[in-house]
């Protein structure tokens, strides 16, 4: 799973996610992408589950880019512990995602396969997402 090798601080404030994605909102690598439509925190486990869903569906063809990284630690206290006596220890890592952010990119696969792969990945994520394509690419089968 993804997590930073080292950080400046061990714990982080919870904070709020405001506004739209300032960067990372356009396709930079692949022909197809999965774009976030709402703000949320996506855990490293969710990113890994989505990655596995995509790679299983495309079956070793094409190339996948993960455009988000879980760099924020989330701390929690153990069960049945009284309040107070400091902040809990870091339990897992999350990526703060704003609307418009590209989460994954794919290239080297046909559009319909990319669309189904992203739909399977979307089922693993806690937010609404949209499949986007570079200009000139098709993501739906022509009847």
UniProtKB/Swiss-Prot annotation:
| Biased segments, Basic residues type | 1-17
Give the coiled coil ranges: none
Is Ribosomal protein there in the keyword field? Answer: yes
For this UniProt entry, the molecular function terms from Gene Ontology, in alphabetical order, are:
rRNA binding; structural constituent of ribosome; tRNA binding
Q: Name one GO biological process term.
A: translation
An example Gene Ontology cellular component term from the record? Answer: cytosolic large ribosomal subunit
Q: Where is this region: Disordered?
A: 1-20
Q: Which UniProt keywords apply?
A: Ribonucleoprotein, Ribosomal protein, RNA-binding, rRNA-binding, tRNA-binding
Identify the InterPro entries for this entry: Ribosomal_uL16, Ribosomal_uL16_bact-type, Ribosomal_uL16_CS, Ribosomal_uL16_dom, Ribosomal_uL16_sf
- UniProt superkingdom: Bacteria
Identify one Pfam family in the record: Ribosomal_L16
**Does the record carry Coiled coil as a key word?**
no
Share what the entry says about its subunit structure, partners included: Part of the 50S ribosomal subunit.
What the protein does?
Answer: Binds 23S rRNA and is also seen to make contacts with the A and possibly P site tRNAs.
The record's comment on protein family reads: Belongs to the universal ribosomal protein uL16 family.
Kindly provide the name given to this protein in its UniProt entry: Large ribosomal subunit protein uL16
Organism classification, top ranks? Answer: Bacteria, Pseudomonadati, Pseudomonadota, Alphaproteobacteria, Sphingomonadales
């Amino acid at each position: 799973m993804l997590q930073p090798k080292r950080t400046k601080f061990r714990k982080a404030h919870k904070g709020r996610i405001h506004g739209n994605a300032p960067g990372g909102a356009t396709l930079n690598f692949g022909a197809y992408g999965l774009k976030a439509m709402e703000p949320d925190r996506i855990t490293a486990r969710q990113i890994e589950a989505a990655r596995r869903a995509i790679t299983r569906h495309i079956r070793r063809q094409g190339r996948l880019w993960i455009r988000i990284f879980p760099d924020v630690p989330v701390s929690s206290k153990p069960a049945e512990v009284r309040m107070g006596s400091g902040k809990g220890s870091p339990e897992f890592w999350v990526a703060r995602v704003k609307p418009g952010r590209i989460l994954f990119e794919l290239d080297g696969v046909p559009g319909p396969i990319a669309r189904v792969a992203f739909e399977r990945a979307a089922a693993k994520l806690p937010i609404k997402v949209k499949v986007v394509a570079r200009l000139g690419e098709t993501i739906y089968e022509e009847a």
